[in-house]
């Protein structure tokens, strides 16, 4: 094959592929890579939207760690929110998946109904609906009154507000549930048959067979839900605006306020990179510890 033939072949096929990929590549460079790198530069600058960035070194980070108590509170709230929602969502998703892993009449409709909340994700509409339901004169307190039970300040009590936000997140377990359900379908039936012959109980089969077989999916859901929880913003912003008394003031809220209320874009960029580093560190820890409990193939 001559050099000319190679060039002709490359031009016809590979350039066509590049042409199809070009919109995605351009979009990634403009909408993702450029903001990602520019935020890193701005995090070392004193930069307001209407002004010109001026390099200040590590001053934004020093201020965050040594002089900004609000930052430490928001970090604490974010980690607490993550510790509540991630295990809660995974346990709920797995429990429902086990319940739905059966062949009965209408099971597809039931699975769809359980999945519907996740279609809306962390949308503003869902957050507004949740706020209306849990306000002092909302639907939930009306039900409690009907049952002659005391009303609860779901959104007004600093000790309760974060739990209410967490309940909304756990309620949207559908995406994890679908993945768990697919994993359960792939567990070999002969393992259960052998265990049943040996006289193993349902509980023992679940923890000795089911859980080890689906640990890769548990790990995947754990990573994805942890990242999502650490980036939470919509529910805290729409439902409580970070209150009461900063009880739901997550890092996403802190970033938003600094950047778009106080227009301190350099400071907000530093916060965004702290969020990125926290996510990266927690993810690395999860990957490092996975070798002790995640089983692939015949390892289980």
Task: Enumerate the predicted regions with their spans.
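A structural signal for multi-pass alpha-helical bundles of membrane permease subunits
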Residues: 4, 8-300
């Amino acid at each position: 094959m001559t050099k000319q033939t190679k060039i002709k072949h490359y031009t016809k096929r590979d350039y066509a592929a590049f042409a199809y990929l070009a919109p995605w590549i351009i979009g990634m460079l403009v909408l993702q890579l450029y903001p990602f790198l520019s935020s890193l530069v701005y995090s070392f600058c004193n930069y307001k939207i209407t002004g010109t960035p001026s390099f200040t070194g590590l001053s934004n980070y020093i201020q965050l760690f040594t002089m900004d108590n609000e930052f430490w509170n928001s970090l604490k709230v974010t980690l607490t929110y993550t510790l509540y929602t991630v295990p809660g969502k995974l346990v709920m998703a797995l429990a429902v998946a086990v319940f739905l892993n059966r062949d009965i009449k209408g099971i597809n409709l039931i699975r769809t109904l359980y999945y519907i909340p996740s279609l809306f994700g962390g949308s503003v509409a869902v957050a507004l609906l949740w706020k209306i339901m849990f306000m002092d004169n909302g639907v939930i307190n009306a039900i409690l009154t009907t049952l002659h039970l005391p009303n609860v300040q779901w959104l007004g009590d600093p000790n309760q507000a974060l739990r209410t936000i967490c309940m909304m997140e756990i309620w949207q377990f559908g995406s994890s549930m679908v993945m768990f359900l697919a994993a359960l379908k792939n567990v070999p039936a002969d393992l259960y048959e052998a265990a049943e012959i040996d006289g193993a109980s349902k509980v023992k089969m679940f923890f000795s067979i089911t859980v080890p077989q689906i640990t890769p999916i548990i790990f995947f859901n754990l990573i994805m839900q942890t990242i999502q929880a650490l980036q939470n913003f919509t529910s805290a912003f729409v439902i409580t605006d970070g209150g009461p008394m900063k009880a739901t003031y997550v890092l996403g809220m802190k970033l938003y306020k600094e950047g778009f209320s106080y227009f301190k874009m350099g400071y907000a960029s530093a916060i965004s990179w702290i969020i990125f580093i926290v996510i990266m560190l927690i993810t690395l820890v999860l990957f490092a510890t996975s070798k002790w409990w995640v089983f692939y193939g015949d390892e289980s």
